[in-house]
Structures are given as structure tokens and as C-alpha cells.
Amino acid sequence: MSTSGPITEFPAPGLRDPFRYITGHDAEGNAVFVQTDNGDHRAVMLGGAAAQNIIYSAGSNPIELTGNVDLEFAKNRPSLHIPNGVCVRMIDFAPGCKSNMHRALCMGIGTVCEGEVELTLGSGEKRILRPGDVSINRGAMHQWRNTSDEKPARMLYTLLDIKPLIVNGKQLDFDMGYLMKEYAEYDEGEGDKKAE
């Protein structure tokens, strides 16, 4: 990990605090906004290299909306990804921030909202993503880097659970490296791939 300056809260300096608008239905069945706020479970990550904001989470897929079951689930801080569920996580990266190479065993759909981010795969292949660009990560080892040494970058990730991933007859392992320090309290961080 490298960074030219710590982030002390979400949002990162220079980025706006996003609103989320959650819809639902009133007692008569009319479509209404049931919640308007700035997200839940904000946290500074990795000593200020990044900060996250949980935009939405649900403990099932298909998602149970009846009786606001999903909104009740979302009151608790979710893990990195949710078995049989979904997590939508916004991450601000400090200028120059570079993650370690890692793999979360989930479908990670990442959209660049602000700045420019380099995505490097375990093979060494690289792509530069700009605002509006989307990465569909299907369990690949990868690394993120904010290409600017002056401005923060922001990405929005939708993380969906997957079935065990078999490549060349071998089941791939969860491997977050030092990023697991942010998620070590969760079962998926147990074992030899837990933070060192």
C-alpha cells in the first residue's frame, strides 16, 4: 500500500458526500422514498489510504423486500461480501493509493465515479478506468491504484456471492492479503489467507 496523504473520514477531501435515496411503498401501495441519507457504516481503511461507505446490503438473493427485511439487515455492518446476498460499497482512494494484489470470492462490479484508477490483474495485464468505466471482476486476483498523486478517486462496488470457483480443476482460494485487516472479524478471513 502506498499513499501520499491520509484520508481521515468519508468522503475524502475534495469529493462530495453522496446521497442515497431508498424507495419502497406506503400502506396504500404507493411508491415513496422511505429513506434519504448519506449511507451507513462509514470507516477509514488501511490507516487512511482509503475510506468506505456502505450504500446498501441485503442478506439474501433474491432480496426480501417485503416488510423491509432488507433494510433491517442493513442496520448491521456487512462483511466484505455477504454469502447469498449483496453488498454495495463506495470506496474513496487517497492520492497515490495502491492496494495489494487480492481476490475476494465474489462477483465484484466496480464503477469509477471520480478520478482515474488503474486495474492490474494477477497476470500483469493492466487497464486504466475513467469515470463511467466498469470492471466486472469474476474472482480474478487484482490490484487497484489511484493514478493521481494529487486528487482522490472514488469507486462504487456491487459485490455478489458466487458458487465455488474452479479453474483448471482447482478451487480458487479467498486471498485478501493485508486488506483482510479491514475484514478480519468475519469468517471469510479465517485460515491461512487471513491478514498477516
From Swiss-Prot:
InterPro entries: Cupin_2 (IPR013096), OryJ/VirC-like (IPR047142), RmlC-like_jellyroll (IPR014710), RmlC_Cupin_sf (IPR011051). Signal peptide: none annotated. The keyword Oxidoreductase applies. Its EC number is 1.-.-.-. One of its GO terms (molecular function) is oxidoreductase activity. Residues 92-156 form the Cupin type-2 domain. It is an enzyme of class 1 (oxidoreductase). It holds the Pfam family Cupin_2. Keywords: Oxidoreductase. Induction: Expression is up-regulated during sexual development. Expression is also up-regulated during confrontation with the arthropod fungivore Drosophila melanogaster. Cupin-domain-containing oxidoreductase; part of the gene cluster that mediates the biosynthesis of sordarial, a salicylic aldehyde structurally related to the phytotoxin pyriculol. The most interesting aspect of this pathway is formation of an aromatic product from the highly reducing polyketide synthase srdA. SrdA synthesizes a reduced polyketide chain from one molecule of acetyl-CoA and five molecules of malonyl-CoA. The polyketide chain is then reductively released as an aldehyde. PANTHER family: CUPIN TYPE-2 DOMAIN-CONTAINING PROTEIN, SLR2101 PROTEIN. Belongs to the virC family. This is Cupin-domain-containing oxidoreductase srdB. It comes from Neurospora crassa (strain ATCC 24698 / 74-OR23-1A / CBS 708.71 / DSM 1257 / FGSC 987).
